[in-house]
């Protein structure tokens, strides 16, 4: 079984197969989605107190906040070596 994992910053990792969208948090509709997820208890804040730069929407309706730029997360998602890096770090631990 080969599960691709994506580093979303500060050692936080998300399964690539669960990601539906990676968007910027600037627009009003995304801010509403974040607030609704917070009220439902479906918000995961992975920013470590830093500014939110990317909002990741998952297929389970969880909303994940990341301090990494959306372009960076997308690049890691599309990178073939990203999974190898995560596997290597998992073997070391």
Curated annotation (Swiss-Prot):
A Pfam family: RemA-like
InterPro entries membership: RemA-like
Source superkingdom: Bacteria
Family, similarity comment: Belongs to the RemA family.
Protein name per UniProt: Putative regulatory protein Amet_2791
């Amino acid at each position: 079984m080969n599960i691709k994992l994506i580093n979303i910053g500060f050692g936080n990792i998300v399964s690539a197969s669960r990601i539906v969208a990676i968007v910027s948090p600037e627009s009003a509709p995304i801010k509403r989605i974040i607030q609704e997820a917070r009220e439902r208890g479906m918000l995961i804040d992975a920013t470590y107190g830093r500014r939110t730069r990317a909002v990741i929407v998952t297929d389970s309706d969880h909303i994940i906040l990341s301090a990494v730029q959306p372009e960076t997360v997308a690049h890691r998602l599309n990178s073939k070596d990203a999974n190898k890096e995560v596997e290597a770090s998992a073997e070391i631990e």
